[in-house]
Amino acid sequence: MSLTVESTSFNLQYPIIKEFINTQLEKCYWTANEVKVEKDIHDVLVNLTPAERHGVFTTLKLFTLYEVRAGGDYWTGRFMREFKQHECQEMAAAFGMVELCIHKPFYNKINELLNISNAEFYTDYVKNPTLKARMESIDTIINHPNSLVSLACFSLVEGMVLYSNFAYLKHFQSNGKNKLLNINRGINY
């Protein structure tokens, strides 16, 4: 059975997809308020250099924007429209829910505590040609005419964007810095 054709049965056709869903919901589930990021605000505002603070602000801004693209535009948007098999629909709903209802609020919560969560903060990336190009490339990937190319490229970019930014935030726990402990707890989930 094709993943792009709606099934007339609710029998499990793709056990691996069901495993992905269960892992996401049972083993990786947490809430945005579970991690007490307010404990890291002092680190960001006082203990980081201006360059480090700029890097953290840029990372948090792009994470929040990216979660909207990943959860809304991709998983519950394109993927759900094109992959109609029941397990695919469930997976898209689960992945989209995590992006939109856990990750996005988690990053935005930090931004709110830093008093930077406003329209200007979330739109000024367009003034930076590199950041603007990065977000435009994500939109291009999501809207690629070939569904499989879109899926492959989106998965690759999601991994590269997330893990490179995770590495940046995690470096604040290395070499004796011991900063941003709670923000990194959210990443460790």
Model-based region annotation:
Residues M1-Y189:
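Non-heme di-metal
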